[in-house]
């Protein structure tokens, strides 16, 4: 599994690769928890590229409900259909048939969960269902999601039950802004995604930013590792490391120094308070201390 992920641009450690392999073979959802920017969402993207299955993403947020996650009716089109029927007189003498026509699949808007379940009917690769940042959703939605994941069925009262012929591959992610309930965790296999080791992060930078030299990749990874040790409000993730290496390469810098860090700090530090804290501690000390570790 590690080799497959690497072929598609994702360098995973053995533990993550094994968790993913088991989830695929056992047909279980995989819950990936970890800090923002640690590469959780990219796992689903890589799976989609590898398998050829459609990536269906459900972005969770506070207040999300079934109408955003499962399905809703296209009320605007239904209203137009109704007005057209009234204008032409078509079906107005058969109200039951008119109502039935309003609640046909033609007017059903399939949201991510229903798309993933209904999309397993053909013989092609199953969809990859990414339920992103489940920790942002509320308890009620989490309970509803648990019910759907138990049997991969969705009932639309007007149309009947949609049932997955083959369950989609399900990846859930959480930044742990709150604890995911134990019931959902029991339904899933679980893996904590930590920031990569220094050498692995260097390899990731070299893979994702091939124009970055080996020294730049090592210097950037070393400084990012030091920033993570400083207790910032939002420590940089792997995504920021990649962005930083790319920015430095675009500028044509051959090595990382205080001036380059100052000019490009916004690619790796995204909060003003964190930037002020880093500057107050001294950029020169940050660079020199980190480079002793990384070179």
For every predicted segment, state its role.
Residues 1-295:
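C-terminal regulatory/interaction module of P-loop NTP-utilizing enzymes
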């Amino acid at each position: 599994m590690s080799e497959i992920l690497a072929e598609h641009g994702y360098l995973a450690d053995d533990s993550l690769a094994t968790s993913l392999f088991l989830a695929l073979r056992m047909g279980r959802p995989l819950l990936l928890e970890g800090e923002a920017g640690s590469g959780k969402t990219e796992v689903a993207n890589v799976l989609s590229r590898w398998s050829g299955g459609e990536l269906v993403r459900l972005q969770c947020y506070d207040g999300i409900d079934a109408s955003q996650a499962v399905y809703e009716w296209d009320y605007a089109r239904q209203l137009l259909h109704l007005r057209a029927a009234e204008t032409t007189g078509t079906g107005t003498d058969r109200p039951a048939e008119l109502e039935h026509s309003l609640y046909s699949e033609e007017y059903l808007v399939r949201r991510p969960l229903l798309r993933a379940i209904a999309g397993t009917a053909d013989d092609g690769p199953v969809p990859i269902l990414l339920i992103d940042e489940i920790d942002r959703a509320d308890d009620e939605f989490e309970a509803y999601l648990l019910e759907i994941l138990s049997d991969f069925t969705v009932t639309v009262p007007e149309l009947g039950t949609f049932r997955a012929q083959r369950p989609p591959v399900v990846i859930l992610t959480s930044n742990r802004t709150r604890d995911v309930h134990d019931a959902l965790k029991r339904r899933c296999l679980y893996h904590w995604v930590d920031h990569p080791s220094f050498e692995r992060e260097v390899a990731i930078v070299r893979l994702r930013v091939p124009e970055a030299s080996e020294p730049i990749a090592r210097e950037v990874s070393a400084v990012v590792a030091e920033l993570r040790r400083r207790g910032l409000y939002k420590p940089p993730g792997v995504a920021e490391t990649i962005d930083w290496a790319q920015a430095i390469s675009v500028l044509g810098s051959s090595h990382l120094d205080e001036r380059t860090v100052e000019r490009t700090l916004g690619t790796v530090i995204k909060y003003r308070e964190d930037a002020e804290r880093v500057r107050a501690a001294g950029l020169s000390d940050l660079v020199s201390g980190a480079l002793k570790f990384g070179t």
